[in-house]
Every structure is written in C-alpha cells, then in structure tokens.
Amino acid sequence: MSMKFMAALAFLALQLIVMAAGEDQSAQIMLDSDTKQYHRSSRNLRKRVHHARHDVAIVFNVEHYGAVGDGKHDSTDAFEKTWNAACNKLSAVFLVPANKKFVVNNLVFYGPCQPHFSFKVDGTIAAYPDPAKWKNSKIWMHFARLTDFNLMGTGVIDGQGNRWWSDQCKTINGRTVCNDKGRPTAIKIDFSKSVTVKELTLTNSPEFHLVFGECDGVKIQGIKIKAPRDSPNTDGIDIFASKRFEIEKCTIGTGDDCVAVGTGSSNITIKDLTCGPGHGMSIGSLGKGNSRSEVSFVHLDGAKFIDTQNGLRIKTWQGGSGLASHITYENVEMINAENPILINQFYCTSAAACKNQRSAVKIQDVTFKNIHGTSATTAAIQLMCSDSVPCSNIKLSNVFLKLTSGKVATCVNKNANGYYTNPLNPSCKSLHPGRTPKELELHQKPTTLLMDEKMGASLNSSPPNCKNKCKGCQPCKPKLIIVHPNQPEDYYPQRWVCSCHNKIYNP
C-alpha cells in the first residue's frame, strides 16, 4: 500500500473524528466550572444518586444552550434544546445552575431517554406570572415515557400562580367559587418507571403541584411544597392509576390536599409526612360521574397534620362503584386539625345537597392506629358511609382525640361496621370492642378449629409434635396463637407453634 494512500486514509479518518466531535461539541466539551458546580451541589445527594455501571455523568448546562438566568428573558427554547441534547446521552445531567432564575413557558419533556438521566434544579425555574402570556396548555412542565429518571436538586420550581387565583376566583354569598378552566398543573409525570423526586421545593402552582399518571416505581423524598391556605385546588402530590410509590419526609402546605391517591392506584407507602395548611391526606375523590374506582394497599406511617381542614380522609361520590380497601393510617399527630378522621361517602362539590343514590364505592379494611392530638371540630371522628353499601371492617386502635379547647370531642357513625380496641376517645357506639393486640393462648382440645390465614377457610388441625423443636429448651409444648390479633371478632386466623418458657419456635 502506497504512502500517499495511507496518508489520504489517515486524513479522512481525522476529518470524520472532527465532524463527529463538532456535532456534539456542546455536550462533550464541558467547562470546568460546570463540572465543579455539579459535583459541589451534589455532595449532599451523592449517596442518593448513583449510576448502576458507574458511568461518568455528562452535564448539560441550560446556559450553554441559550438560557438566560436573569428572571426576565424567556428561556423556553433553550430548555427544549438542552433536553434534546441530553436525552440521548447515558448518565446525562440536565442542569439548572444555582443562583440563577429562568423564566419558561410550558414545556414538554418526552422520552424515551437513555438510562440514569437526571434533571437537576439548583437555581429557580419560574413560570410567567401573567396568565395572558401563557400558552394554551393545562400542564406547565410535562414529563412522560421515562425510565430510570431523577428529578432533583436544591432549587425552586415556582408556578407564580397569584394572578391565576385572583383572576379566576370570586366570593359569592360568602363562598369562594373558582373557575379552573385553563389553570395549569405545575409538573406532571406520565407513563414512567423507576422515577425519583428529591429535595426540590415547589411553590405557588396555579393548580396542582406534582401529579403522577400511570407510573410504576416512584420514590419521593424530602421535597417541600408551599402555597397559601386559600389558593384553590393547589394539591401537593396527586397519584392516579399508579403503583409502588414511596413518599418519605416531605413537608407540604397548600390550599388543598397535601397528598391525594386517586383511582387505579395501589401499593402506596407514605412515611414522615408533615401537612399543613391544606386539606390533609385524601383517598379520592372516587366514583365521580357514576364511574368505577379502585384503590388498594395504601399505608401512611408517621405524619403530623397542623391546622388542616381535614386529617385522614376517604371521599367518594354517590352513584359510583368499585372498591377502596386495605388502607392503614398509623402513628399520626393532629394539631388543631378539622375533621381528623373522616370517611365521607356523600362527597359533593355542589352548593346544594347532592341526590342520594343507591350505588357507591365499597370501603373496607381500613385501620386507624395510634392517632392522637387535637381537633378543631366537635366531631373528631366521622364515619359517614353509604346507606346501600355500608363500610366494613373499619378498625380503630389507640385513638385519642380531644378538642383544641380541651373539651370532649364526639364520633359520628353512619353505616360503618367494624371494631375498636382501647383506648378510643371519643367513643363510637356502633363499633364493637375487639380483643387487645397481644398473643392469645387458647386452651382447646387436641383437635381444634384453625382458620386459614390467607383464605379464611375452616380447617381441622391437630397440634404438632414438638419433640426436639425448641432448640434444647424444655418443656417444649404445642401452643395455639393468634396470627393477626387485630382482626375483628368473626375472623381470628390461628396457627400452631411450639413454645418453651414463652419463646416461640416453628414446628
């Protein structure tokens, strides 16, 4: 092969390399200041954000794509360009730098994108305060079809909703009536999997702040959501048709629900929630417009409700159908909260009374455990269930609520069936007393009735042979114990074990 040919080939290869580099120059040639800023602002999040194959993060700073962080100029196009450049890169970081304020109109951030994609807000993203300048969209920032996506940062996402509220709300006969037409949600995430939202502050959305639709596997940690007490429909976190959510250590104060779980949702876990002001935590509303709704396996463990309009609320419309079940609230403190415990199957937004209908969403298997504090309303517990589809298996355990004034609160119960274990204050007369949640030894014949734990079927079961089953402890004897002692009187799942000196061993 001639030297001239070799030289020409080398020159062609060099040209291709230069062309490829030029196509993605803004992404690959990173300024030292951007990289330093990203790592500096990520120190507190470093343990929380990691990449499965230890890929090197590529930072896409919105300023490099034309964004101007002076709080005046429109940076919408620059944000779109940044997203388009970052979406196709593995371990990309879309960076909104600190100490800058970027004004943007509505944005669409659609995937699919490469894995380990982070949208990092360390500065402020602000919406246009004037509704007249808003594009015709019900969503300000819409994320969709993403997998392994992080929305995080120490910055602020400000919906600047004041003008929306003042322009669309009027007081009629002492009642505030708002026109929700056109008022946008701040952030909506749809059709996405393995999503994390961390540390951000969301404030003053014209309507809902953070909404999820048809998502699977979402973690929300340490975010703050703020809006005035009288801001209309400014829900904090709304979840629809989604599953496997973990919400932890969030502080939310708005003009509506702090957290709302809507139809089609299941396996929702919430821990260490601080709510107030707002309308508390809601399941629903469900069954609107005679629709069918399903919600199951919602667990709130650890919460504080401060000066809220409601505490723990399940709300359904008359005429609907479906099921809301396996809902547990525990370890909750109420501080001057109105309606601390509320099941309302007569939910209605009309100024006039809604017509009583025969069908309703069924509510069953709901537990309120370790709930204490003060109520701003006389009825601290309200179990208002459907006439035709009563609530079943409602359980109250260690509930102690009194009025903020120190006076005795009351319980209002309509068509709610279930039981309680002491203490229960205020008392709910129609609920039945249940057994205390401790292991109960039953002295029965060698052959006894055993309730199958999963199916509830009756079985004949003989005591096991416990010889050599207690790891050297003597005497080792059969013992019948309650598996779930908090179940109602008519259902006591039991099983045989081997016991020695109050220690339990599997037979």
Swiss-Prot record:
The active site is at 256 (proton donor), 279. GO terms for molecular function: polygalacturonase activity. One of its GO terms (cellular component) is extracellular region. Keywords: Allergen, Cell wall, Cell wall biogenesis/degradation, Fruit ripening, Glycoprotein, Glycosidase, Hydrolase, Repeat, Secreted, Signal, Zymogen. PbH1 repeats lie at residues 215-241, 242-263, 265-285, 295-316, 324-345, 358-385. It catalyses: (1,4-alpha-D-galacturonosyl)n+m + H2O = (1,4-alpha-D-galacturonosyl)n + (1,4-alpha-D-galacturonosyl)m. Its EC number is 3.2.1.15. Glycans are attached at residue 267. It comes from the Eukaryota. PROSITE patterns: POLYGALACTURONASE. Residues 21-54 form a propeptide. It is found in: Secreted; Secreted, Cell wall. GO terms for biological process: carbohydrate metabolic process; cell wall organization; fruit ripening. Residues 1-20 form the signal peptide. This is Polygalacturonase. It comes from Juniperus ashei (Ozark white cedar).
